[in-house]
Regions:
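Residue-level preference for short coil/turn positions at secondary-structure junctions
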Residues: 64-66, 104-105
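Short hydrophobic beta-strand that contains or immediately precedes a catalytic carboxylate
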Residues: 59, 69-74, 90
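Rhodanese-like catalytic fold shared by cysteine-dependent sulfurtransferases
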Residues: 5-50, 80-85, 89, 93-107, ...
Length: 163
């Protein structure tokens, strides 16, 4: 773990790709040994109506072709520490106010911290309720790093907003 202090706030992040790989492997081990995790997760997602999640490989191609808008709905500090390339920072708490700035002609893919993070699920629900075509990416930045996929960093205090 690494920590970055900014006044009274401390942002913690995973120290590197090796740590991310370990985290993802540990999560996979827990999932394989504790079948209840899968059952609880699937029941929760089924109740929320967001069972499907976009496939990582398909997402990479669709982003490259400009077919989707990718939203990182985590807090801005987490986005700045590392995000999927091309993703737009739009924390869940700001999503409702910014709906008019999002493109309606493209599918929106929301992601957060990983398969057990509910931020992306809530974002997809809100987007769908407001007429958007939306789905979630169940993986987060640690999953991408663990698979050797590129992650962008933005250590400035400015936020990337959708234009």
């Amino acid at each position: 773990m690494e920590a970055q202090k900014d006044g009274v706030h401390v942002t913690y992040s995973l120290a590197g790709e090796e740590v991310c790989s370990f985290f993802v492997a540990l999560r996979a081990l827990a999932e394989s040994r504790l079948l209840e995790i899968e059952q609880v997760t699937q029941q929760y997602l089924k109740e929320r109506g967001v069972m499907e999640a976009v496939d990582r490989e398909a997402l990479v191609d669709r982003v490259r072709n400009g077919e989707v808008t990718v939203l990182d709905v985590r807090p801005v500090e987490e986005y700045q520490a590392g995000h999927i390339p091309g993703a737009i920072s739009l924390p869940l708490g700001e999503l409702k106010r910014k709906l008019t700035e999002l493109p309606r002609e493209r599918e929106i893919v929301a992601y957060c911290r990983g398969p057990y993070c509910v931020l992306a699920i809530e974002a997809v629900e809100m987007l769908r309720e407001n007429g958007f075509t939306a789905t979630r990416l169940s993986e987060g930045v640690p999953d991408w790093l663990a698979r050797g996929l590129p992650v962008s960093h933005d250590y400035t205090k400015e936020r990337r907003h959708h234009k």
